[in-house]
Amino acid sequence: MDVYSAGSMQDSCIASVIDWLEFGSSFFRPLGDAHDIGLFGPASAGMPAVEATALFAFIHGLAAVQVPFTLEGKGLNRRHSAGLALQAFRYCLHTHVSHSRELPAELAWGGTGMSPKIADQLALAGEVLAELLTDADREECARLIEYEADANMLLPFHLEHLDHGYFRRRPPVPTGRFGTSYPESNAWRVSVLARALLAAPGHGHASRWEEALVMHLANVLSVPADAEDTTPVDGCLLHELHAGANLHPSFALEHHGFFHPGYVNRTLLSLFSTAYAYDDAGVERPSLLLRNVPELWDVQRRLLLWDGRLAYPAGNDYPRYCWGLLYLLPVLAFLQHEYSDGIAAWAEERLVDLLIREQRVNEDGSFCGGRLEQWRELIEDEGVAPPGRPAPSVYYRSQVDTPYYMALAWWWHNRNGQGVEVAPVDVDGALDRPFVERDCGLVFHRAPERFASWSWPGAAARGRSSCGVAGQPHQPLPGAGRAMRPPGPQPSRARLRWRLRNGGYAR
């Protein structure tokens, strides 16, 4: 199939990824004189450069081995993509602390709070590269995953684990609002522990991996009611595993100090990757793996705007159309195949269209190169000293994230046979309900043609109100409370008002 003959939404998606390959390859470089390994972006970006390189390996691995398109019409070829993918994959393996290769110490990564996420991304890259990997590659990847699983075995007394939280770093603050939680951290620990167990069930540490897996599973999408839940789990009761709630009672998720839909997507992404790992191994999924997923998705889907974007009632702390929004793409693919969710299909089509439209504005195949060009210039200007210079890791991740998550969504559709039948759904009617989470001072309502919200606190510790209209940009509003008036005949018009009471709760 020629890339220009793409017809379906999934075909358009992967064709867009192929259009990115030449631009993305311009950021890839060998590591010094070592021509067998290379990385995406500068080594000075630290461990985030490893993550960006793992994503790059997946993208080129897919292009080299899996996609049904001919690349030659784009001036590319599979052999070249295979070489880049293997160099990137091996860079991630060889810089890990479990590897014996002597490389500069500052490049080493592993055994930290975020490294299980990268281990899972490497495992996914290994899936698409499977036929190109050597026995040494497979052994080194298995050793890396075992190392990360060992690093996440239970510590005594539920102590905080390294640098990125452990179950919950601290109890809720006195107001009852959580502010900081770690569902996504526990979820990617679940992934690496599960992958280690599935690959080596007879390993000497398998029983401790299993113990840690169950504990982390119980504390991913945990809610306050779990503290008294007597559901039997792996020989004990759920409340005995409960280390603290990571979601509010109505399934709102806070992170970075405010309601953060992006981390819902990141959490679900790790859980869904784990679900497919169990399926591929022919092993039954743990009963806790998808616990509370439908309830959490019922909140998340009411944030879907008409062009595929997410609303962020409390604000956002990442670049527009980047990071948390992009995690949504493979999440939507999984939801369609697992739950036959028609709203997920509706949202995916619109989000892909939004991303491709921006790519077409750029002449170099990039997704966000145009609007982030000034950022790149500041990063590469040696005369600009931090904190004036943006973090290189965020810029380079932003460049590789979009094609990666589009490619991963395609891969997950492909493993399920591409086509998914979902019943027609009245999207606006299904999502037309107000949502209130008093625990975190949040109220929002997605009506058929309007979205309005109020959140206290918000990003940068500020209260935020916003309103969006179908077909128009979603904009913050000045002031506090607003009346929401969904359109329609006067007799059927609903109206909801709110104001702040009791130290910031929305009533």
Enumerate the predicted regions with their spans.
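Extended polysaccharide-engagement surfaces of secreted carbohydrate-active enzymes
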Residues: 282-286, 306-311, 321-507
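Well-ordered mid-protein domain cores that form the structural environment of catalytic cofactors
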Residues: 88-164
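Long, repeat-rich segments with strong aromatic
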Residues: 260-334
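Low-complexity, Ser/Thr/Pro/Gly-enriched N-terminal "stalk/linker" regions
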Residues: 1-102, 227-228
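An acidic intrinsically disordered interaction segment
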Residues: 8-26, 74-90, 210-243, 287-297, ...
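Carbohydrate-binding/catalytic loop surfaces
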Residues: 29-46, 101-113, 117-124, 163-188, ...
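Active-site lining segments of carbohydrate-active enzymes
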Residues: 124, 131, 143-288, 301
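Well-ordered alpha-helical scaffold segments within catalytic/enzyme domains
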Residues: 2-7, 54-77, 117-137, 189-206, ...
